[in-house]
Amino acid sequence: FTVGQRKGLALGTPAPDGKPRFVLEIRPKTNEVIVGSRELLSIDEIRGIRATWAGIPVPEAEHFLAQEPKLGVRSETFDVTAQVRAHADPVRGTAHLEWAEDTDAETPGKLRVETVVRLHDGLFGVAPGQTMVLYQGTRVLGQSTIARAYSLAREDLDDLRENAAV
């Protein structure tokens, strides 16, 4: 399966609203494929890892990187435009850096810096492994590899589902 895929899902029963369903997320560790409406494919927030800065980072990032690592600590936000595909239009948003647990590390509790970008307008077709380039005006700030891209609307639905199950 591929994120965004619509055909060949072999779901058996249609969605309650009769609209097509799409692959929203693939979870290889649990062997799950999450499906939902097209609207839930729109990505509002991207988390990048292994950032590379072009020159001196913006002051908010530079100040953050000079501090001692601590889980959950985040930088001040700064305005950016983010570009995910080479020929796609950049999308405006705000970004911050955050210390998060490195889920790919062999050592539990290891921390990594994640670049978190909240987009003003959603993007479609964003997937882990792609590169995200950040700009301020015409200045390239740097790039990072997308570790997670998700829809805040989908998280709201997940929260509703969890609260309803309690």
Describe the residue ranges of each PLM region:
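AMP-forming adenylation/ATP pyrophosphatase catalytic core
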Residues: 1-166
